[in-house]
Amino acid sequence: MANSKSAKKRATQAERRRQHNASRRSMMRTYMKKTIAAIEAGDKEAATAALATATPLLDRMATKGLIHKNKAARHKARFTAAIKAL
């Protein structure tokens, strides 16, 4: 448990950030799942539309530091390749 005033403040800030990041991470995963579902269904138009909404979101999460930029690039590349293969 934090003893000093500054440590207590940092603990509350960390908890606030953790909850905010969890919400963002959940949103990102939801959009990724929508893209995956469209790809598995074989619907190229829906998959392309889902990827168009997921791509800027992945880029934003990478910019904010929620995920690594290489992870965002890897997901985008794999989704794009899967859609082209449909």
From Swiss-Prot:
The record, for Pfam families, names:
Ribosomal_S20p
Q: What GO biological process terms are annotated to this protein in UniProt?
A: translation
**Record-level Gene Ontology MF annotations:** small ribosomal subunit rRNA binding; structural constituent of ribosome
Gene3D superfamilies the record matches: Ribosomal protein S20
Residues annotated as region Disordered? 1-28
User: What job does the chain carry out?
Assistant: Binds directly to 16S ribosomal RNA.
> What is the name of the protein in this document?
Small ribosomal subunit protein bS20
This chain's source organism reads: Aliivibrio fischeri (strain MJ11) (Vibrio fischeri)
The primary gene name is rpsT
